[in-house]
Amino acid sequence: GRSIYSVGDLYSGYDQFQLAVDSCDITTMRTPIGLVRMCTLPQGATNSVAHIVNAMNKVLKDCIPSITMPFLDDIPIKGCSDEEKDESEDKDGCRKFVMDHMKDCEKVLERLENANLTFSGEKSAFGQPEILVVGHLCGAYGRKPSPSKVNVINDMKEECVTQMEVRR
């Protein structure tokens, strides 16, 4: 486990990736208000996930795996391990391991800014003792499944009847 974490989620993740101009026409669909043509990466399209994974790996290549392991548009930023943790204070009274973590956060943010990508302020958190990443809680204790996800399974009826019950 780690003593400090941060997590960022891209603001409208898929919408931040522009489609090639010649690809826009093949996304055209009819709606009650007329034809709509996508100009950004459509969420749920066959190759959208692969495109996001490749783009994030390219943008953050020098930060993977030492600082982050992005999952689609979720970007967890891990602090130092307990073995590397330096509790000494700098001249401003901030612990060194916290400052090191903030420098790592800055490095990730710079890479995203250079790629014209933006974090969502509402869905991002910095300098936290625990974060939720892809259904798992990460903290000083290590990683464990989120209790809310486990409770859904524990509270499940013996037999699922509807599609909605199966999906939960």
Language-model segments: residues:
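Retroelement reverse transcriptase polymerase core
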Residues: 1-168
